[in-house]
């Protein structure tokens, strides 16, 4: 009876994985198809990848995606690390409610976050013209009187939804750190800044790296929030793919999606490997 149950469990899991990953496998396979069809295999070819890298619109969206992701990751990692340290220094009754607020953007629906940020930018830009006109009358220097959504709003949106992930990654490393290390460093003559760079940063470095990789992955993979905050002058890779699918799903789209999938998969694998090594290292230290 137990063997039958075990077989059924494995069969069920296999069917679940087939259901989840069969479309992705087909997408990857037909990205190498020499023909235009997504149903009939004509032979192996790199034609669609070659065509992909010659497409100016796609390359521009790749450049925008990478630039936004890198800048958002750097800024969110710095801001999130300092925020996590600030939370760590607070009393528990103050820290716990703030951590709950920090977790809301991660649990909130992306469409709600995207629409709310879009409305925020629209409200800000509507009042900016009057302020800029008044400021320009002072004669100090001139401010632009007309602002629109574009690369700047897209970057701000990505920074905003990435910071909570960094805080969530750095926080546990701070709780594992011995508070006495900082006091000991300062007793030995270190300033607070020296203790920060020589004691705190090395202790929480794994959390910072994991948070940065997670933020970069989330930025590359984001579509909904970017769609509502990019305006008409900027387009990420996910937005470009969405626009292309409205016309026709070609092997060129398969090639883009394959590259995006592989990129995210590699980043997630790096994150998981790092976390597994950290857990083994921590377990080894506890056994000593």
Predicted regions and their residues:
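Short hydrophobic faces within alpha-helices
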Residues: 62, 87, 104, 180-188, ...
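Hydrophobic alpha-helical transmembrane segments of multipass integral membrane proteins
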Residues: 59, 63, 67-79, 83, ...
